[in-house]
Amino acid sequence: MGADKITSKILDDANNTASKIKSEAQKEADLILEKAKIEAEEQTQDILKRGDKEAETTYNRILAEARLNSKKKMLKERENLINMAIEKLKEDLKELPKKDSYKDILLKLIIEGVMSLDGNELVVVLNEQDMELIEDSALWAIEKELESKVKKVIILKKGAPANIIGGCIIKTADGTKFCDNSLESVFERNMESIRANVASLLF
């Protein structure tokens, strides 16, 4: 399936991105913990010098607070890293139309979109670059392939080019129904899964 291929490609890119920034995350974590430990030691040393009878209790309290603050910082840093990785994946998504496999993915996205709509005459909306990539003969081939499956006449026509990264938007002729299979929409629909996978790769 076209959308599945895109999701798989996104997760592959996530894996590559994760390996690059995971070491940075570890360095940041070590720095936070070390700073917290030094801060706690300095404060408790001052207390011990003053002969505070409750030094041990105070020391433990400061250390507990330091660990809590460290954990909060780590959680915030983790979220920042996940967001950074996702933004990197969004940038990588813009490069997908340049790949050799893109035309095959695009054709599958068109087929998925057509199959999801109950209509005989449908409009295929592409960006300007893909308007040239997908020739009329390719749409005719899709018509024939799907007609044999659904046992009804299907007419596909190109619509006006859209401002999308890639992929397609399939609409009924009257415009009342549509399936948005643009690359960015496929990405957003799979965001929950992408975030979960990025998190598992990073941590």
UniProtKB/Swiss-Prot annotation:
Function description: Component of the A-type ATP synthase that produces ATP from ADP in the presence of a proton gradient across the membrane.
Q: Name one GO biological process term.
A: proton motive force-driven plasma membrane ATP synthesis
Q: HAMAP family from the entry?
A: ATP_synth_E_arch (MF_00311)
Q: Report the sequence similarity comment from the record.
A: Belongs to the V-ATPase E subunit family.
Query: Is Zinc given among the entry's keywords?
Result: no
Q: What is this protein called?
A: A-type ATP synthase subunit E
Q: How does it assemble?
A: Has multiple subunits with at least A(3), B(3), C, D, E, F, H, I and proteolipid K(x).
Membrane topology annotation: Peripheral membrane protein
Q: Which GO terms describe its molecular function?
A: ATP binding; proton-transporting ATP synthase activity, rotational mechanism; proton-transporting ATPase activity, rotational mechanism
Compartment(s) of residence: Cell membrane
Bilayer-crossing residues are none
InterPro entries given in the database record: ATP_synth_B-like_membr_sf, ATPase_E_C, ATPase_V1_Esu
What's a single GO CC term here? Answer: proton-transporting two-sector ATPase complex, catalytic domain
- Keywords per UniProt: ATP synthesis, Cell membrane, Hydrogen ion transport, Ion transport, Membrane, Transport
Pfam family of the protein (one): vATP-synt_E
